[in-house]
């Protein structure tokens, strides 16, 4: 079995998807949580000056989505056929667009930037939500299961549900009117390995 080391800050953020994949697969890994003050020294040594980083027997992989895809395929959480794998990638690429549109709102709500919270909710969060959540619901309905693609959980389900749950904790009515997505999130978070990790993981604001 390869030796895995995941390096990210002591928050959920872009590192949590990989942690969830490891826990769902039941694969041991080193969860290296970097202190903010240690980041400037490490940053120039990373491929793109960003975290997370995954080390596999010492070989480094950067970029969160690349890490998710690699781990998903390694652990059988990427779809059962080439077409399912491609559909998983497609849905997650759309979800990344959604998260990119929400980023200005997150930076204000989380206190990284000053701004009018009500304004960013109205002008950024609500339009992005109303544009993208129906697309996710469409894929969920098309699958005919409790997952976005196929009949079993994929890495994209793990990342998407955790991100949406985080947004719902930040904006309580974020999923209002989207009962199907709420049930989807609840189902994935009740998977035994995921439920155990959520109960045990360090409590962080995001």
From Swiss-Prot:
Reactions catalysed, as given in the entry: RX + glutathione = an S-substituted glutathione + a halide anion + H(+)
Phosphoprotein keyword on record: no
Keyword terms, alphabetized: Transferase
Enzyme class: transferase
Keyword Transferase: yes
GST C-terminal domain residues: 81-206
Any single GO BP term: glutathione metabolic process
EC number, UniProt record: 2.5.1.18
One MF term in the entry's GO annotations: glutathione peroxidase activity
One cellular component (GO) term of this entry: cytoplasm
CDD domains attached to this UniProt entry: GST_C_Sigma_like (cd03192), GST_N_Sigma_like (cd03039)
Binding annotation for glutathione: 8, 39, 43, 49-51, 63-64
Domain GST N-terminal as annotated: residue spans: 2-79
Biological function: Conjugation of reduced glutathione to a wide number of exogenous and endogenous hydrophobic electrophiles. Can also function as a GSH peroxidase.
Family from the record: Belongs to the GST superfamily. Sigma family.
Protein name as catalogued: Glutathione S-transferase 1
Organism: Ascaris suum
Upper classification of the organism: Eukaryota, Metazoa, Ecdysozoa, Nematoda, Chromadorea
Gene name tied to this protein: GST1
């Amino acid at each position: 079995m390869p030796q895995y080391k995941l390096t990210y800050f002591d928050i959920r953020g872009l590192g949590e998807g990989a942690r969830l994949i490891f826990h769902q697969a039941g694969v041991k890994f080193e969860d290296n949580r970097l202190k903010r003050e240690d980041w400037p020294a490490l940053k120039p040594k990373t491929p793109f000056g960003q975290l997370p980083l995954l080390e596999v027997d010492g070989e480094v992989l950067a970029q969160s989505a690349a890490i998710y895809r690699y781990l998903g395929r390694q652990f059988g959480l990427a779809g059962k056929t080439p077409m399912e794998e491609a559909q998983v990638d497609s849905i997650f690429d759309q979800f990344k667009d959604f998260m990119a549109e929400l980023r200005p709102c997150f930076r204000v709500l989380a206190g990284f930037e000053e701004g009018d919270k009500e304004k960013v909710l109205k002008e950024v969060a609500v339009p992005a939500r109303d544009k993208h959540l129906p697309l996710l619901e469409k894929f969920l309905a098309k699958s005919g299961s409790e997952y976005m693609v196929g009949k079993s959980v994929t890495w994209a389900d793990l990342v998407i549900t955790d991100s949406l749950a985080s947004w719902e904790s930040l904006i309580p009515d974020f999923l209002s009117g989207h009962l199907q997505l709420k049930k989807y999130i609840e189902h994935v978070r009740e998977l035994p390995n995921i439920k155990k990790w959520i109960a045990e993981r360090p409590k962080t604001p995001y």
